[in-house]
Amino acid sequence: MTLIRVGILGLARRVGTFAEVGLRSWEEAGCAAVEQALMESADDLYVVHRPVVIRSDRAELERILRDWCDTPNIAHRCDLILTVGGTSFSPSDAVPEATRAVLERDAPGIASVLRHLGGPEAAFSRGVSGMRGKALLINLPGHATGFANQELLIQAMDALTPYLPEMVSGLNKDPVPPWGAAPPPR
């Protein structure tokens, strides 16, 4: 199987305040936990771009998601994009809206599994998942939306990682012609 190029994007209401005192924000720790879960599942399968934490800004998020999905530079294009945080009811949390704006097809089952794993508090998560081109995008909840600690985030990644390679490889298969249509010429 070919390498899966992964982009991990943390969304924070404030960026930089934790670093100034030598601490990591929850979003930075969440991105690191997601990366670690991927590497522990199959470190020879994933190439993780440096995790990025940005301020929760819808326009900037849409721009980054489009760039990571559509860039002609194959070294910078992502097959899998995982966002961490920004899915709660707060007016500043617009990750689901930004993600929906760039998606071409929905994959609601992934978000359903994440909400199930998060327990009752996951009712606060509005995360979505889907596809753009040959990239799979998944919104992972932050600490305020059902994953109050890193252990739950790691459990969610443990539940997803066995299926991610097949999901991503499915995006790269040739489309099947509709019934009755002639197959494409070879």
Predicted feature descriptions by range:
Residues 1-186:
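Non-catalytic beta/alpha edge segments that cap or flank active sites
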